[in-house]
Amino acid sequence: MAGNFWQSSHSQQWILDKPDLLRERQHDLLALNEDEYQKVFIFFANVIQVLGEQLKLRQQVIATATVYFKRFYARNSLKNIDPLLLAPTCILLASKVEEFGVISNSRLISICQSAIKTKFSYAYAQEFPYRTNHILECEFYLLENLDCCLIVYQPYRPLLQLVQDMGQEDQLLTLSWRIVNDSLRTDVCLLYPPYQIAIACLQIACVILQKDATKQWFAELNVDLDKVQEIVRAIVNLYELWKDWKEKDEIQMLLSKIPKPKPPPQR
């Protein structure tokens, strides 16, 4: 996407302040502590990733779907819509916006049913409960909550340009790209511009690969290095949390603690 980020709705409406983000979460944080809340979002980012891969979507589409998912819950409690319904809805919408092509509703439902049964049976004892009408209704609600701001700028393009400018090899790009994917399991996509996220992921990759010669290159960048370090800390904290998390043992308990949507009134 080659448009001007700074003039986009992403820049002007969807780079949020951390205090505002935390304030919107207060209802959910009565039921879950902050680590548990992040684990729930790691899990559903994994769900979106698996569904996207089984649908053979490009990573750009999967990343956009994950950002939609996080944007929705940046303004809504988990009780407003079941995350298991919102996840495939975000994929459906992202595939349209990223011009991937139309995913048939029946195929999407079939993939969801298969993935829950084969990949996430440790989290859900029951079958995937939703049908096409639920996803289409949810899509309208999602569009409304996103204010129809559907263009998402990702860190992948600036990352490619940075690695090219640095003159480094494919190993660095491959690792940095994976770290960008992992960053979708944090709040950084809601708080920082994509070029800052790209720089932070590149910096982490350089440390892992012990590329000391790149320090001067980073020092000469015209960028807010304090912001970059905030992103680095958020991603490192993710890895610390991930390292000790026994997802298959814990996720059912965490999902049971999520506030549930109120049933509609009986007529």
Swiss-Prot record:
SMART domains: CYCLIN. Residues 48-151 form the Cyclin N-terminal domain. It is found in: Nucleus. Component of the Cdk8 module of the Mediator complex, composed of CycC, Cdk8, kto and skd. This is Cyclin-C. It comes from Drosophila melanogaster. Pfam families: Cyclin_C_2 (PF16899), Cyclin_N (PF00134). It comes from the Eukaryota. InterPro entries: Cyclin-like_dom, Cyclin-like_sf, Cyclin/Ssn8, Cyclin_C_2, Cyclin_N. Keywords: Cyclin, Developmental protein, Nucleus, Repressor, Transcription, Transcription regulation. Belongs to the cyclin family. Cyclin C subfamily. Component of the Mediator complex, a coactivator involved in regulated gene transcription of nearly all RNA polymerase II-dependent genes. Mediator functions as a bridge to convey information from gene-specific regulatory proteins to the basal RNA polymerase II transcription machinery. Mediator is recruited to promoters by direct interactions with regulatory proteins and serves as a scaffold for the assembly of a functional preinitiation complex with RNA polymerase II and the general transcription factors.
